Amino acid sequence: MFSLTQKIGFNAEKTACRYLQKQGLSFITKNFRYKQGEIDLIMSDQSMLVFIEVRYRRFSDFIHPVATVTPLKQRRLIKTALHYLQKHRLLDKISCRFDIVGITADRQITWIKNAIEVEY
């Protein structure tokens, strides 16, 4: 049994996935977990692997959902993505980027490509 918060999160991820597929991305997997991190969606954009954080806010009058991705969350996303790349033996074999999709209660979607910069 899922909590209301989890159901809202799943719906936001489903909405984001459909939106991104309409934009030309291909679905690979969802909810990839490693230790304290989770990547909501992993998709491909032509030959690039895209790690996607989906954020939903019911009340976005004061802060947009995209702005809620903290530096700590960014570090966890990067560590989890590195684990994914190592697990699938893709490290140094494929280009990747980190995108954020923000969704508001009125279903407005904001997609920011390369939202998180990673230094190697």
UniProtKB/Swiss-Prot annotation:
Top-level taxonomic group: Bacteria
A molecular-function term among this protein's GO annotations: nucleic acid binding
- Gene3D superfamilies from the xrefs? 3.40.1350.10
Give the range the annotation lists for the signal sequence: none
**HAMAP family listed in its UniProt record:** UPF0102 (MF_00048)
Q: Which family does it belong to?
A: Belongs to the UPF0102 family.
UniProt xrefs under PANTHER family: UPF0102 PROTEIN YRAN
Q: Which NCBIfam families match?
A: PRK12497.1-3 (NF009150), PRK14684.1 (NF011277), YraN family protein (TIGR00252)
Name of the protein described by the UniProt record: UPF0102 protein CBUD_0259
Q: Which organism is it from?
A: Coxiella burnetii (strain Dugway 5J108-111)
